[in-house]
Amino acid sequence: AEIKVRDGYIVYPNNCVYHCGLNPYCNDLCTKNGAKSGYCQWLTKWGNACYCYALPEKVPIKDPSYKCYS
């Protein structure tokens, strides 16, 4: 079966984004989780956050309707 993918801000299980400063950190994080690539998006409403392209559906992405539960 084909793996379903989508783009988004990769999150921890508690819906918190991965904060970042540099693109290589995010690209590494995203590709380790099965994404095509990723980068550090600066100044999102959650701060600087990793964004992944073609991330497998099994890996959670930010759900803006929920808070980050720390």
From Swiss-Prot:
Annotated GO CC locations: extracellular region
UniProtKB keywords: Disulfide bond, Ion channel impairing toxin, Neurotoxin, Secreted, Toxin, Voltage-gated sodium channel impairing toxin
One of the record's GO molecular function terms: toxin activity
Tissue expression notes: Expressed by the venom gland.
BP terms from Gene Ontology: defense response
Compartments, record wording: Secreted
Disulfide bonds: C16-C68, C20-C40, C26-C50, C30-C52
Domain named LCN-type CS-alpha/beta: residues: 6-69
Residue ranges that the Swiss-Prot or TrEMBL entry lists as coiled coil: none
Similarity field: Belongs to the long (4 C-C) scorpion toxin superfamily. Sodium channel inhibitor family. Alpha subfamily.
Function text: Alpha toxins bind voltage-independently at site-3 of sodium channels (Nav) and inhibit the inactivation of the activated channels, thereby blocking neuronal transmission. This toxin is active against rat Nav1.2/SCN2A and B.germanica Nav1.
Domain remark from Swiss-Prot or TrEMBL: Has the structural arrangement of an alpha-helix connected to antiparallel beta-sheets by disulfide bonds (CS-alpha/beta).
Official protein name in the record: Alpha-toxin Bot9
UniProt source species: Buthus occitanus tunetanus (Common European scorpion)
